[in-house]
């Protein structure tokens, strides 16, 4: 946490939020992201520091996503969705084509989270407009199946 203090100060002065990104390793683990946010908020008046959580970097937390989300929720700046299969097979997958994102999205909806939700395009083999449309169509299908649940 101390290593990013200059960035914490700079973003505070600019009036910007600072989002910690779960890009794998120790720093991408939900408990560690939360610990860094707590430390910065408690010891450096950094209420603007939070978490940008990307499902495509969260394959290791499919099974405990409900607990991870609950832990991170007070600090979330944004949640980015992705199709989800075990073992990141594949890592980037359109919404509605994975085995687990429907349950994860249902968990998000039931959690009371009301912050921003994003859809990213990390597919270099597909035009961004096409990739985003596919994700929006997949999200629509997932949500339609959850209407009465």
Sequence positions of predicted segments:
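Substrate-binding cleft of extracellular glycoside hydrolase catalytic domains
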Residues: 1-3
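Histidine-acidic metal/acid-base catalytic patches
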Residues: 6-9, 13-15, 30-149
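Acceptor-substrate binding/catalytic loop of class I
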Residues: 25-26
């Amino acid at each position: 946490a101390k290593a990013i203090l200059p960035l914490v100060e700079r973003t505070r002065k600019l009036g910007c939020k600072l989002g910690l990104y779960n890009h794998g390793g120790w720093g991408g683990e939900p408990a560690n992201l939360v610990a860094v946010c707590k430390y910065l908020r408690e010891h450096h008046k950094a209420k603007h520091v939070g978490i940008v959580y990307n499902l495509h970097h969260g394959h290791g937390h499919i099974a405990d996503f409900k607990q991870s989300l609950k832990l991170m929720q007070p600090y979330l700046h944004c949640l980015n969705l992705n199709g989800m299969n075990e073992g990141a097979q594949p890592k980037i997958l359109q919404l509605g084509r994975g085995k687990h994102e429907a349950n994860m999205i249902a968990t998000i909806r039931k959690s009371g989270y009301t912050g921003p939700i994003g859809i990213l395009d990390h597919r270099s083999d597909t035009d961004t407009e096409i990739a985003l449309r596919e994700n929006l169509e997949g999200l629509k299908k997932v949500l339609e199946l959850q209407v009465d649940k």
